[in-house]
Amino acid sequence: MSRHGLYNNGNTCFMNAALQCLSVTPSICNFIRIYNTEDENLIKLITKFNLGKCKTDTIKLECRKILDNQKETLTNDELQILTKLEKSSDDIFIYISFKDLIKKLDSNRQTNTDNNTISQIDRKPLDASPLLSITRELASGSIFENLFNGSQNDPHEFLAYILDRLHNSKSTSIQIKLPSNLNEIDNYYKLYLQHFKTRYENDYSYFVKNLYYYIINCVECSKCKNISTTFNPNDIICIPVPTQVNDKMITIYDCLNEMFKTDTIVYTCENCGNKDKNLIENKIFSKPKTFIIKLKRYSSTLNGRSTFKLNNMICYPDILNINKYFCGKAETNYKLYGIINHSGSLNGGHYYSYVKNINPDYKTFNEQWLCCNDTQVSNISDEQAMASQNAYMLFYSLIE
């Protein structure tokens, strides 16, 4: 066993389970490493101007005062950092708190330079309350306010929130050049490149290439056969759970088949105006390096008056192949390294995670599964990890 647990600060098991999985996600670990120099300069500036002592709602104002009153004495780096802080201080302070916690979660493993082995150090539980406090404060009055109100909440919502904040903390403008032979290439790829440029040229970060990916939606008119195409950026894929699959055990592939099946859609053809029996097909267009799956276990009755939890056992593999759902031709396989489980009922359950520690290369994983249940961390067998009836979210890393 080589991992810190996390204290539960009042129904924060959803957050703890998500943080444990993020802390062993290769894209997240590398994200934290590549910004070390930039972050050192950021912390120095925050310390120099005592911005860390400011309330979150006054930091932007303080940055503006410094820029107005001390501009002549500031270095170019300080000008850039203060300008970024004025624009995105909320996201940046969440990032700083998140990074500090993730580094501590990873600090239970250190390399012995004499024999290149990994030694164990103190594994006392860690407290995520600094991250909880700042996210709660900054979410106040927003659509995310209920996420940090002390009630049982959803790790998927927390992941979507924190990933967006991390992206915003490093978001910048870049020049994205389209190929000179744009009109000669495949039409779908052309549309993808144009959408990518429009969406990310002024909002680009490390996450765009490492955690985000595109899903393509094609709608075909049943009458004139015109095809309308849209591209949607995505970071977490939410897949339905079939109620029955020929009396057999449900697998993750059954869920993916349901997600990516050709279906009818209410749609008015932009070419001929036909509304009847139009078909939609979805596929993954750009290959994600991190493939996070949410199983839609929470469902509503037909009349929509009540919600219930689907407790079906869903079989998931150690190696996931998504070739069938991907537009590319190359083999696309993923390695399972994290699972968020939910036990209990819809209104009174508990979240915990299974994870594999990431190796020092930040690409591969230790083969020992660990159960992280708030402060408690214990070894579990492969059989136990791979047969959880409580599996709710699955974390896969691209095998390159």
Region annotations inferred by a language model:
Residues T12, C218-E220, T290, Y352:
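Beta-sheet entry/capping signal
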Residues M1, Y7, L19-L22, N50-K53, ...:
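Exposed substrate/partner-binding surface patches
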Residues I143-D247:
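A broadly conserved sequence feature marking short terminus-proximal activation segments
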Residues T12-F14, Y214, S286, L346:
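Short, surface-exposed loop/turn motifs at beta-strand boundaries within globular domains
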